[in-house]
């Protein structure tokens, strides 16, 4: 969000002034959150941007209504969408709406910021998530997306 980005920019500017070192930098992909009902959140590229850039991408989706946690709390509206490169499997964007969307977006953001093989959709397949949680949507979406490659 703009407030969070402005806070980080101010912190980095103060460090540069105090330490005389301006080598620190902000992350490239800053998440957005819209606190409506349901919440909307995203980080990274959109399908429209990837199509315009002619990037070969695939989409993995998870519907919240299929998650145990969403069923338990009665918040079945929502979904998580992961956009990833078809060849490298690098995560390019994550889009979410529904219960806790602005909170769970940071899980994907953390993986997107990893360099090299640390940023792949396979991370979500090979990671153990607490159950039942809304974060489980990442595994469901990752499996959905990888299955589309075959």
From Swiss-Prot:
Q: What gene does this protein come from? A: sthA
Family assignment from sequence similarity: Belongs to the class-I pyridine nucleotide-disulfide oxidoreductase family.
GO annotations of cellular component type: cytosol
UniProt keyword annotation of Oxidoreductase present:
yes
**Which co-factor is required?**
FAD
Name the SUPFAM superfamilies for this protein.
FAD/NAD-linked reductases, dimerisation (C-terminal) domain
The UniProt entry lists the main location of this chain as: cytoplasm
Q: Cell wall biogenesis/degradation among the record's keywords?
A: no
InterPro entries, alphabetized: Class-I_Pyr_Nuc-Dis_Oxidored (IPR050151), FAD/NAD-linked_Rdtase_dimer_sf (IPR016156), Pyr_nucl-diS_OxRdtase_dimer (IPR004099)
What is the catalytic activity of this protein? NAD(+) + NADPH = NADH + NADP(+)
Stated name of the protein: Soluble pyridine nucleotide transhydrogenase
Q: Where in the cell is it found?
A: Cytoplasm
> At the top level of its lineage, which domain of life is listed?
Bacteria
Q: What does this protein do?
A: Conversion of NADPH, generated by peripheral catabolic pathways, to NADH, which can enter the respiratory chain for energy generation.
Alphabetized, the UniProt keywords read: Cytoplasm, FAD, Flavoprotein, NAD, NADP, Oxidoreductase
Mind listing the GO biological process terms from this record? 2-oxoglutarate metabolic process
Task: Give this protein's Gene Ontology molecular function annotations.
Answer: dihydrolipoyl dehydrogenase (NADH) activity; flavin adenine dinucleotide binding; NAD(P)+ transhydrogenase (Si-specific) activity
Q: What is its EC number?
A: 1.6.1.1
> Known Gene3D superfamilies for this protein?
3.30.390.30
Q: Note how many cofactor molecules are bound and how.
A: Binds 1 FAD per subunit.
Q: Name one Pfam family in it.
A: Pyr_redox_dim
């Amino acid at each position: 969000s703009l407030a969070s980005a402005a806070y980080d920019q101010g912190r980095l500017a103060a460090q540069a002034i105090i330490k005389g070192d301006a080598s620190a930098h902000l992350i490239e992909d800053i998440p957005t959150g819209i606190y409506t009902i349901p919440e909307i959140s995203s980080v990274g590229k959109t399908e429209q941007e990837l199509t315009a850039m002619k990037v070969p991408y695939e989409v993995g989706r998870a519907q919240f209504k299929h998650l145990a946690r969403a069923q338990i709390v009665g918040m079945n509206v929502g979904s998580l969408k992961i956009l990833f490169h078809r060849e490298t499997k690098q995560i390019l964007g994550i889009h979410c709406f529904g219960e806790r969307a602005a909170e769970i977006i940071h899980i994907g953001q953390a993986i997107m910021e990893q360099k090299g093989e640390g940023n792949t959709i396979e991370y979500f397949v090979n990671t153990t998530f607490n159950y039942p949680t809304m974060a489980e949507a990442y595994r469901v979406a990752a499996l959905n997306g990888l299955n589309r490659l075959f």
